[in-house]
Amino acid sequence: MTRTHEVDFVLLRHGQTEWNRQGIIQGQEDAKLDGDGVRQAEALGAALAGGRFGSIDVVASSDLSRASDTAYRVANALNISISTVGLTRELRERHVGVLQGVSRRDVDKTHQQLWRTFRKGSDDDWKGHGGESYNDHWDRAVAWMERTARSHAHGTRIAVVTHGGTLHVLKDRCDVDDPLNRNNHKRGVVHNCSVGVVRITVTHTGCEWRCVKWGDTSHLDEANVGSLPHGHGGDAGGA
């Protein structure tokens, strides 16, 4: 493929919510940041403003409030006007239908077969819970990333605040192009306000993805701010 330009996406998981702490499956329910989540977002913003993960030119986010509130704090730390933060439904968590709002403690009793099928994840088109399939989620998130890469100049670095399940999808997309790198990053361990970097190379025939960094929480450790791993509230629908 003939290279045209590269864009880096600095991928950020939102701060913690009360539902994360309680182990409640969130999906597209609009849970708010709790006190720990605010502290995580502020520590993340400070790390980005200090250049720890390189420069940031643009901030974009899922429109769910746990993500957008994190993004606004990041933008403020970077002296980027919050009015320029691009919010989109395409970066939302996967909609998991009737599983949303159910605690992991209870879900195996209240929705046993649905939960087990969802957890098994063997059918990427399955949406028996009444929400989105894995492929639905993939299509919208990957499309947004590639469209955004095409619309920005070479060398642009975009901070993207999104969700654990969406990050899972984006890591899977990287693994399609870079299978040898697959085992170098634990895609299932993505803590609140962790940092990853994905580089998309736009060519004349498509886009090539590469995972540069994944799930970095060193900035939170140094700020003495704890964080919960994705999956605490229920895998792809729990972030």
Where are these regions (language model features)?
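Acidic, low-complexity terminal tails and accessory targeting/binding regions
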Residues: 1-8, 80, 94-106, 154-156, ...
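Phosphate-coordination/substrate-recognition cap region in phosphate-metabolizing enzymes
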Residues: 3-4, 44-116, 187-191, 196
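Beta-strand elements within well-structured catalytic alpha/beta cores of enzymes
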Residues: 8-12, 60, 86, 156-162
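Active-site metal-binding loops of divalent metal-dependent hydrolases
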Residues: 15, 164, 217
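Loop-to-helix element that buttresses phosphate recognition and phosphoryl-transfer chemistry
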Residues: 16-74, 127-142
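Glycine-rich phosphate-binding loop signature in dinucleotide/nucleotide-binding domains
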Residues: 51-55, 148-156
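Phosphate-handling substructures
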Residues: 76-143, 212, 225-239
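GST superfamily/GST-like fold recognition
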Residues: 164-168, 194
